Amino acid sequence: MLRLHWLALLVLLLPMAAAQLRPEPELDAQWDLWKRTIQKAVQRQGGRNVPEVDLGEEPEVHRCPQRGARLGKHSFQLAMNYLGDMTSEEVVRTMTGLRVPRSRPRPNGTLYVPDWSSRAPAAVDWRRKGYVTPVKDQGQCGSCWAFSSVGALEGQLKRRTGKLLSLSPQNLVYCVSNNNGCGGGYMTNAFEYVRLNRGIDSEDAYPYIGQDESCMYSPTGKAAKCRGYREIPEDNEKALKRAVARIGPVSVGIDASLPSFQFYSRGVYYDTGCNPENINHAVLAVGYGAQKGTKHWIIKNSWGTEWGNKGYVLLARNMKQTCGIANLASFPKM
């Protein structure tokens, strides 16, 4: 099974379109990175079930041709990373964790109503305004929902108090009874917990360990409160754009099940295989803009800085709901 996975990965990363010539030093660097990644995979496997990979030829990571080619050009790049020894199924099973409740009643007043009276800015990046804490790593715990929720809470805390502070995803993993800890959860359940609990601890007071244990919330470590939440109208990227522009970072859900997402490196991500109806991973929309004419969302992931572009991915915007970006979006009220 692992051997088949590696063969599929080689096919994905080897040339799939006309090759673009690169200087020898860059090829050497790519080859060295490939070998180091293979060695790291061997170490992580403990010498067991190591895939049989022929390293006799130098695999070059090329620009990824988009299925359907709707962008009209190759818009993003793939690269080997620390997830190289995992299948896409393993990544989804152990490193996502968005679980949408079967019944999602929407209490009165929780639907976000955008203000259409004025134009939204052409581009927004809340990182530059100091609303976004450093990229975190959820590890092999299905706690993406907690990191997404915490990121949105951190942005609203900055907006309300002027102070940026890392809040505790572990507080949510342990204590949100309507969710399932490392087994998965949903962002609005987390916001509602913080409201009813009258607070959430800081990361310093309640550090992340990525395991399920009993709730150890302490009011002495409380760093933020929440008075409710708002949900963005589904399948409405224009409404999501307004929310990100006027409110701050917004919790969103996407499909993160494809190998192209697993090995994303840079550029604007777009893959027609990304299914808007298969949302399995919670992330944080921290802005939007355009790169070389291609509109995108700025997405903060929780897979550490060694994934993607220092932990971030640019996701195609206004391309028929890329990966379901606007289907499960929400933010807390403070």
UniProtKB/Swiss-Prot annotation:
GO terms for cellular component: extracellular space; lysosome. The keyword Chaperone does not apply. Residues 1-19 form the signal peptide. The active site is at C144, H281, N301. Residues 20-119 form a propeptide. CDD domains: Peptidase_C1A (cd02248). Keywords: Disulfide bond, Glycoprotein, Hydrolase, Protease, Signal, Thiol protease, Zymogen. Glycans are attached at N108. GO terms for biological process: proteolysis involved in protein catabolic process. GO terms for molecular function: cysteine-type endopeptidase activity. Pfam families: Peptidase_C1 (PF00112). PROSITE patterns: THIOL_PROTEASE_ASN, THIOL_PROTEASE_CYS, THIOL_PROTEASE_HIS. Induction: Up-regulated in response to V-Jun induced cell transformation. Its EC number is 3.4.22.38. InterPro entries: Papain-like_cys_pep_sf (IPR038765), Pept_asp_AS (IPR025661), Pept_cys_AS (IPR000169), Pept_his_AS (IPR025660), Peptidase_C1A (IPR013128), Peptidase_C1A_C (IPR000668), Peptidase_C1A_papain-like (IPR039417). Belongs to the peptidase C1 family. Closely involved in osteoclastic bone resorption and may participate partially in the disorder of bone remodeling. Displays potent endoprotease activity against fibrinogen at acid pH. May play an important role in extracellular matrix degradation. This is Cathepsin K. The gene is CTSK.
